[in-house]
């Protein structure tokens, strides 16, 4: 089996309804997977039931069987029994903390490596990389490790934008990612803009959507990745 992982920048683009823009990206992963487990651990400011209801409504057109992992007495067994895994956005630190708490990090990696489809957005995409060291989120809780699912061998930065409001004197996103590359010049970071996604199918990695992505690695800073690019070279360990 091969990895089949869709890594969305966000749950919305502009003023579109929840997950509406992502339906064309998500649908191919659901052809042979109807029973999905949703992991809402990144949701801190809402109940898990409320979060689950939003996802079920947003994906209702696909007619999937979606349950929340919080509804199951054994989270590990729930992941094993599902045809696919959904992880939503919110706070990445809280998400990873809970994944470690329930001993799910290794299990999810193993299940996805065996071919179980994975769909994440925002924080759910952050945890798909090597670590969460390039998240935008506030560290409201300390997970045992920053090491993440390693579904792709690089770092992600969802919601990427280098916009700086006039008069604002804080660092831009590009400056923050430059800091990462100064500490770790060998690990690539891909900034994915809202409305876009990365799709890994085995040894193939594609950029989906109508927005470019941006690469940061060593001396390479904010290098545009054109719409529709094949990024399979980022999966090679030699990078």
Swiss-Prot record:
GO cellular component terms, semicolon-separated: cytoplasm
Location in the cell: Cytoplasm
Catalyzed reactions: Dipeptidase E catalyzes the hydrolysis of dipeptides Asp-|-Xaa. It does not act on peptides with N-terminal Glu, Asn or Gln, nor does it cleave isoaspartyl peptides
Annotated coiled-coil segments of the chain: none
Single annotated GO MF: dipeptidase activity
Record-level GO BP terms: proteolysis
EC number: 3.4.13.21
Residues forming the catalytic site: 122, 137, 159
Pfam family, one: Peptidase_S51
Catalytic class of the enzyme: hydrolase
Principal subcellular localisation of the protein: cytoplasm
Keywords, alphabetical: Cytoplasm, Dipeptidase, Hydrolase, Protease, Serine protease
Function: Hydrolyzes dipeptides containing N-terminal aspartate residues. May play a role in allowing the cell to use peptide aspartate to spare carbon otherwise required for the synthesis of the aspartate family of amino acids.
Membership in a protein family: Belongs to the peptidase S51 family.
Family matches, as PANTHER family: ALPHA-ASPARTYL DIPEPTIDASE, PROTEASE S51 ALPHA-ASPARTYL DIPEPTIDASE
Protein's recorded name: Peptidase E
Source species taxonomy: Bacteria, Pseudomonadati, Pseudomonadota, Gammaproteobacteria, Alteromonadales
Gene: pepE
């Amino acid at each position: 089996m091969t990895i089949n992982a869709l890594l969305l920048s966000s749950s919305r683009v502009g003023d579109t309804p929840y997950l509406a823009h992502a339906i064309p990206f998500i649908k191919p992963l659901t052809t042979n997977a109807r029973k999905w487990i949703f992991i809402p651990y990144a949701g801190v400011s809402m109940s898990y039931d409320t979060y689950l209801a939003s996802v079920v409504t947003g994906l209702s057109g696909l007619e999937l069987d979606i349950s929340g992992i919080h509804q199951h007495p054994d989270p590990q067994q729930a992941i094993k029994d599902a045809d696919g895994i959904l992880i939503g956005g919110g706070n990445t630190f809280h998400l990873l903390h809970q994944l470690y708490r329930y001993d799910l990090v290794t299990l999810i990696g193993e299940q996805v490596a065996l071919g179980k489809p994975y769909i994440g957005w925002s924080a759910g995409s952050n945890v798909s990389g090597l670590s969460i060291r390039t998240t935008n989120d506030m560290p409201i809780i300390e997970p045992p490790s920053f090491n993440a699912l390693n579904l792709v061998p690089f770092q992600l930065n969802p919601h990427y934008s280098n916009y700086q409001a006039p008069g604002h004197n804080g660092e831009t996103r590009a400056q923050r990612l430059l800091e990462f590359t100064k500490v770790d010049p060998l690990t690539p970071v891909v900034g994915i803009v809202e409305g876009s996604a990365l799709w890994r199918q085995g040894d193939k990695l594609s950029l989906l959507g109508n927005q470019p992505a941006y690469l940061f690695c060593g001396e390479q800073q904010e290098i545009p990745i054109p719409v529709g690019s094949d990024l399979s070279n980022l999966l090679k360990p030699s990078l």
